Swiss-Prot record:
<dbReference type="GO" id="GO:0046429">
    <property type="term" value="F:4-hydroxy-3-methylbut-2-en-1-yl diphosphate synthase activity (ferredoxin)"/>
</dbReference>
<dbReference type="InterPro" id="IPR011005">
    <property type="entry name" value="Dihydropteroate_synth-like_sf"/>
</dbReference>
<feature type="binding site">
    <location>
        <position position="312"/>
    </location>
    <ligand>
        <name>[4Fe-4S] cluster</name>
    </ligand>
</feature>
<comment type="pathway">
    <text>Isoprenoid biosynthesis; isopentenyl diphosphate biosynthesis via DXP pathway; isopentenyl diphosphate from 1-deoxy-D-xylulose 5-phosphate: step 5/6.</text>
</comment>
<keyword id="KW-0479">Metal-binding</keyword>
<dbReference type="GO" id="GO:0051539">
    <property type="term" value="F:4 iron, 4 sulfur cluster binding"/>
</dbReference>
<comment type="function">
    <text>Converts 2C-methyl-D-erythritol 2,4-cyclodiphosphate (ME-2,4cPP) into 1-hydroxy-2-methyl-2-(E)-butenyl 4-diphosphate.</text>
</comment>
<keyword id="KW-0004">4Fe-4S</keyword>
<dbReference type="Pfam" id="PF04551">
    <property type="entry name" value="GcpE"/>
</dbReference>
<feature type="binding site">
    <location>
        <position position="273"/>
    </location>
    <ligand>
        <name>[4Fe-4S] cluster</name>
    </ligand>
</feature>
<dbReference type="InterPro" id="IPR016425">
    <property type="entry name" value="IspG_bac"/>
</dbReference>
<feature type="binding site">
    <location>
        <position position="270"/>
    </location>
    <ligand>
        <name>[4Fe-4S] cluster</name>
    </ligand>
</feature>
<dbReference type="GO" id="GO:0141197">
    <property type="term" value="F:4-hydroxy-3-methylbut-2-enyl-diphosphate synthase activity (flavodoxin)"/>
</dbReference>
<dbReference type="InterPro" id="IPR045854">
    <property type="entry name" value="NO2/SO3_Rdtase_4Fe4S_sf"/>
</dbReference>
<dbReference type="GO" id="GO:0016114">
    <property type="term" value="P:terpenoid biosynthetic process"/>
</dbReference>
<dbReference type="GO" id="GO:0005506">
    <property type="term" value="F:iron ion binding"/>
</dbReference>
<keyword id="KW-0414">Isoprene biosynthesis</keyword>
Length: 373
């Protein structure tokens, strides 16, 4: 029930990764990358399907060898979600996976080779109508740029990006997006800011090698949050040393917190104190697990007492405000006659949330049909 995001997004061109639009006002796409051995087709397919289940729009797959390229062919045949092939060092692998139906090619200018090799990749991408991501990384800049700047700097990352943007421009190829990732938040943010002023192409956001699940999520939220709040970014990946499924969840949580794109339930919950009338922490943790299948955007407030409970509930789709013996229940900001037993809040609220989600889905379908008329 909270208002729309006040963020004005940067204008960019539009490309498509498979059937997923990127840029020009399209929803910010959330993606992850498999961490299985690509040659283990069954494991890689299973992980891709797990990512798709939690809402991934795009999945990137590392293709380090020709054997991996042959495995990629089999993987592509077994999944529906768009796949990006991550190519380093050997440009010929890009040519091979293009034959196998890849939806996007990620190339790293720091190691893909000379302009003639890039030309070969671009011409192949053009023939197969495949977009490219120019993926700059602070840890793998070209040797001459490393020598020039001594260390990764915003100027270094942007210069590397612009070199290859210029190559694609000369080849009259405009179906590409760009990333300038770094593990340092300020370095990445400033690099993206500068690049956003110089090109119109979509930008893929990420803080590379951000760390483990907790620290990496925080670092990514800070860095990407700064950029997204300024309207910069058309697609993103959260890089965690963790289960890739967590990357998708964190990505959507960041977008949800900025009201840019919502998927599933936005739980508003207090940190608890001695005033709580029911187990708020246990309730939230249990409901988050039980309701992972709900994709309907919805605000649900779970507050343990009457200090902030009513106020939060009044701006939520559903809300519970703790009170002695029985807690108050709100729907669409209005307090209901029904009250929840404090020892059974989880089951009662789950039932209400599922019913509300179904109702909102019906209303959304009706609204879409009205617009289409």
């Amino acid at each position: 029930m909270h208002s729309e995001s006040p963020i004005i997004r940067r204008q960019s061109t539009r490309i498509y990764v498979g059937d997923v639009p990127i840029g020009d006002g399209a929803p910010i796409a959330v993606q992850s990358m498999t961490n299985t051995l690509t040659t283990d087709v069954a494991a890689t397919v299973a992980q891709i399907r797990a990512l798709e289940k939690v809402g991934a729009d795009i999945v990137r797959v590392s293709v380090p060898t020709m054997d991996a390229a042959e495995a990629f062919k089999l993987i592509k045949q077994q999944v529906n979600i768009p796949l990006v092939a991550d190519i380093h060092f050997d440009y010929r692998i890009a040519l091979k996976v293009a034959e196998y139906g890849v939806d996007c090619l990620r190339i790293n200018p720091g190691n893909i080779g000379n302009e003639e090799r890039i030309r070969s990749v671009v011409e192949c991408a053009r023939d197969y109508n495949i977009p490219i991501r120019i993926g700059i990384n602070g840890g793998s800049l070209e040797k001459e740029i490393q020598l020039k700047y001594g260390e990764p700097t915003p100027d270094a990352l942007v210069e590397s990006a612009m070199r290859h943007v210029d190559i694609l421009d000369r080849l009259n190829f405009d179906q590409f997006k760009v990333s300038v990732k770094a593990s340092d938040v300020f370095l990445a943010v400033e690099s993206y800011r500068r690049l956003a002023k110089q090109i119109k192409q979509p930008l893929h956001l990420g803080i590379t090698e951000a760390g483990g699940a907790r620290a990496g999520s925080v670092k990514s939220a800070v860095g990407l949050g700064m950029l997204l709040a300024e309207g910069i970014g058309d697609t993103l990946r959260i890089s965690l040393a963790a289960d890739p499924v967590e990357e998708i969840k964190v990505g959507f949580d960041i977008l949800k917190s900025l009201r840019i794109r919502s998927r599933g339930i936005n739980f508003i919950a207090c940190p608890t104190c001695s005033r709580q009338e029911f187990d708020v922490i246990g309730t939230v943790n249990e409901l988050e697990q039980r309701l992972e299948d709900i994709t309907t955007p919805m605000d649900v407030s779970i507050i343990g007492c009457v200090v902030n409970g009513p106020g939060e509930a009044e701006v939520s789709h559903l809300g519970v405000a703790g009170s002695s013996r029985k807690s108050a229940f709100y729907e669409d900001g209005i307090r209901q006659k029904e009250r929840f037993d404090n020892d059974n809040v989880i089951d009662q609220l789950e039932t209400k949330i599922r019913a509300k989600a179904a109702m909102l889905d019906v209303n959304n379908r009706i609204n879409v049909q009205e617009v289409e008329k």
